[in-house]
Regions:
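NAD(P)H-binding glycine-rich loop region in Rossmannoid oxidoreductase-like domains
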Residues: 26-75
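A short C-terminal helix-loop "cap" of Rossmann-like NAD(P)-dependent dehydrogenase/epimerase domains
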Residues: 156-169
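Conserved beta-loop-beta element that borders a ligand/cofactor-binding pocket
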Residues: 94, 126-148
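N-terminal Rossmann-fold NAD(P) dinucleotide-binding loop
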Residues: 4-5
Length: 174
């Protein structure tokens, strides 16, 4: 995905780390042996799995959003339970959709929102919390990703690109 690609490049180029990206095929039923073998020698697991939320949320797509997060996380946890030497750290993604929209939230906010997105984030985090000891678990709640080469920025600029206003518009990234 978008964040994973940029994070992998950064960790490889700047940090000198060896990255083993796991594609969606790794999490299909019947792949658990291969997943266990892959995770056996990992020091850190970074779980950024999840289908994009910027599509129409039909009942079928809601199921895809669920499966791509909770089912994948469940399979990672199941594989980690099977490896002999546990990784030191697992970082598991979630989203600010966990919080109610009217609340100014920070890392200490425990209030959960209502609706599908909040329920999805809650279930995703709940599954990640089954991470086996002694692996330390860190859950990150991402917001909207802005970048000049992708993320939400490109989608927000599309309507402006068709108008002459776009040439006179200045954007400031803070």
């Amino acid at each position: 995905g978008y964040i994973g690609k940029h994070l992998s490049n950064y960790l490889t180029e700047k940090g000198g780390h060896r990255i083993i990206p796991l594609g969606r095929s790794m999490f299909r039923e019947g792949m658990s042996g291969h997943l266990i073998q892959t995770l056996t020698h990992c020091d850190v697991i970074i779980n950024l799995a999840g289908a994009p939320i910027n599509k129409r949320w039909t009942p079928e797509y809601k199921q895809e959003l669920f499966n791509s997060r909770i089912v994948v996380t469940h399979r990672i946890i199941r594989a980690l339970n099977a490896v002999k030497t546990k990784p030191k750290l697992m970082i598991s993604a979630s989203a600010v959709g966990y919080y109610p929209p009217e609340v100014e939230a920070d890392e200490y906010t425990r209030t959960r929102g209502d609706g599908f997105l909040s329920d999805l984030c809650y279930a995703w985090e709940k599954e990640a919390k089954h991470c086996p000891q002694p692996t330390r678990l860190v859950i990150t709640r991402f917001g909207v990703v802005l970048s000049p080469d992708g993320g939400a920025m490109q989608q927000m600029l599309r309507p402006l690109q068709a108008t002459k206003v776009a040439t006179a518009l200045s954007l400031i990234h803070i």
